[in-house]
Amino acid sequence: ISDGGIQEEISQGAGRLAGHLGLDNLIMFYDSNDIQLSTATDAVTSEDVAKKYEAWHWKVITIDGNDPDAIRTALTEAKAVTGQPTLIIGKTIMGKGARKADDSSYERNCATHGAPLGGDAYINTIKNLGGDPTNPF
């Protein structure tokens, strides 16, 4: 779920119910990059998401969401939880490693939402992430 999505009432209602029912087969990953579709999240909310979900009887695990090992460890921990759902809060950097055509950074840029990388931006990003643009996968 995204920063904007976690603010939506439907996700909050489902979150309250899942905690109340103790749905321990539910693991939700929250991509917390502090940016939503049109602005930084602190422009529209000051809530503590972790405390809110803990109050709803969720197990909350906060990690570096850009670290694959931290994600694996959190998922292993979450699968072992019984009697309550788990929220993994991955603190991430939106556009991590993405570079513009002029090689400046796309990181933490709200305008990056829905903006596909093409041309030189694509090539610069693959290079910046340690890949080969001629064989990126």
Predicted feature locations:
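Glycine-rich ThDP/TPP pyrophosphate-binding loop and its adjacent helix/strand module
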Residues: 1-137
